[in-house]
């Protein structure tokens, strides 16, 4: 486990009192602190969260701990009595940037969940790393569920970013800015820097992070159910809920793949229309030599292509909206899966070591939070269905419009090949033939993808809500 090591106080730990340092030593301290964070943030001795461990804590609106499970107590090395009524930052690691927590509170205060890699500190001074999800509770307060970090390679990029952010925050504190200002600047720094890893902002990171992490973590998760005793009905219903969530997740993964393919084909359509416009440029070179029967079809095809371009641009926007709604649904499902695993693990914990009414209340809290997520999933699914219908209609319109200029170009080539060109123009004929072949393949691909859109079943999460009502009813029986 390791022994707590004495650490020299740095600027942050002394509360930011500038008068304790002269300018030179402060600058040196900040540089060394930043370097320490960047180099050692992944190499320090630490507590390891087990591959199937999952733990939770509940706080009030001010972040004071009101409940937890035994796994949290074990990993944090705090007794339950020490955790209860303590601020949640009792486990805060000073290496974590204030900007990360500013992002968290901004999300929570707007009613949104928050997902992040977090480096906490146990009572003995050693860190432990987790994937943390925090969600607002319907009756007030927050639920945080944590698992181990399942993708250390991706996490290393975030740890490095945290180190950079803390270094920047220390500099700002040294310049006399207060902690609130510093955290706000740190949050913006994180939001901006995630673009280095291909993300739009930190919300974009969250939409990727949770489905990605939970899919890896679940490979080691326990699917054991409580077969006997008063908790058996609860455990059975939770197990059925987990199966239903897996089916939902599989459907959304397939839909996400299809949406990505559609977006790719949409880009191909845009490229095809650009090539059709290039044919007009090539035809203009021969404008004085082509007969009207040779020039007019190409000019009309290009003119129609410009109209199709507007439809294709709109299609791309709708496909992006569809992908966004799919990502929201996938993220919501992933959050529900995390909370379901947490509930299942806690039911097993209660079955092994019952602690009376207190743990029944905890189960009610977990069930209520999970119900909120599934209800949110229903709203996201409704938006997803709307976006899907719009994409289908726009795809059908684009396909219908593409056929007209495509047919005109095909007729032009057929006529030239049958009756011969009025002038020798092999480059133009070759370009037209190549575009016909390319666009035909693209249209076939688009028709195939359009057909697949209707094969992916879209369902309401009603069955999941029914299962949760069963869980809630069984939990209430335990209070009798």
Regions found by a protein language model. Name each.
Residues 462-480:
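Acidic, low-complexity, intrinsically disordered peripheral segments
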Residues 11-12, 21:
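Aromatic (phenylalanine/tyrosine) cluster motif
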Residues 200-306:
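Charged heptad-repeat coiled-coil "rod" segments that mediate homo-/hetero-oligomerization
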């Amino acid at each position: 486990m390791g022994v707590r090591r004495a650490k020299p106080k740095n600027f942050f730990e002394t509360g930011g009192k500038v008068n304790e340092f002269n300018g030179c030593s402060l600058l040196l301290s900040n540089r060394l602190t930043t370097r320490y964070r960047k180099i050692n943030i992944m190499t320090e001795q630490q507590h390891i969260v087990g591959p199937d461990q999952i733990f939770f804590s509940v706080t009030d609106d001010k972040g004071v701990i009101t409940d937890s499970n035994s796994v949290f107590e074990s990993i944090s090395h705090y007794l339950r009595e020490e955790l209860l009524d303590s601020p949640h930052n009792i486990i805060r690691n000073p290496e974590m940037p204030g900007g990360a927590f500013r992002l968290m509170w901004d999300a929570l205060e707007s009613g949104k969940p928050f997902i992040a890699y977090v480096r906490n500190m146990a009572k003995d001074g050693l860190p432990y790393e987790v994937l943390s999800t925090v969600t607002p509770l319907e009756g007030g307060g927050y639920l945080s569920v944590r698992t181990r970090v399942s993708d250390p390679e991706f996490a290393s990029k975030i740890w490095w970013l945290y180190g950079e952010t803390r270094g920047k925050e220390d500099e700002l504190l040294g310049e006399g800015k207060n902690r609130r200002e510093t955290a706000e600047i740190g949050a913006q720094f994180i939001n901006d820097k995630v673009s280095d890893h291909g993300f739009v902002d930190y919300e974009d990171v969250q939409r990727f992070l949770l489905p990605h992490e939970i899919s890896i973590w679940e490979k080691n998760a326990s699917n054991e159910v409580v077969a006997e005793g008063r908790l058996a009905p609860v455990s059975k219903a939770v197990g059925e809920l987990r199966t239903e969530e897996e089916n939902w997740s599989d459907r959304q993964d397939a839909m996400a793949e299809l949406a990505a393919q559609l977006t790719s084909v949409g880009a191909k359509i845009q490229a095809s229309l650009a090539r059709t416009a290039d044919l007009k440029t090539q035809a203009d070179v021969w404008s004085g030599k082509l007969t009207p029967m040779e020039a007019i079809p190409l000019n009309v095809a290009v003119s129609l292509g410009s109209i199709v371009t507007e439809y294709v641009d709109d299609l791309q926007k709708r496909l992006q909206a569809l992908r966004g709604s799919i990502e929201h649904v996938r993220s919501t499902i992933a959050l529900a899966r995390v909370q379901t695993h947490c509930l299942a693990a806690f039911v097993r914990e209660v079955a092994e070591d019952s602690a009376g009414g207190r743990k029944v209340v905890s189960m009610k809290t977990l069930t209520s939070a999970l119900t909120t997520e599934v209800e949110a999933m229903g709203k996201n699914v409704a938006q997803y269905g709307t976006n899907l219908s719009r994409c289908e209609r726009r795809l059908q319109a684009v396909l219908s419009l593409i056929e007209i200029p495509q047919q005109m170009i095909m007729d032009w080539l057929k006529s030239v090949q049958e009756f011969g060109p009025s002038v020798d123009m092999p480059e133009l004929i070759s370009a037209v033939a190549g575009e016909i072949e390319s666009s035909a393949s693209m249209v076939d691909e688009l028709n195939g993808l359009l057909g697949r859109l209707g094969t992916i079943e879209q369902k309401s999460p009603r069955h999941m809500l029914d299962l949760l009502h069963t869980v809630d009813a069984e939990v209430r029986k335990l209070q009798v």
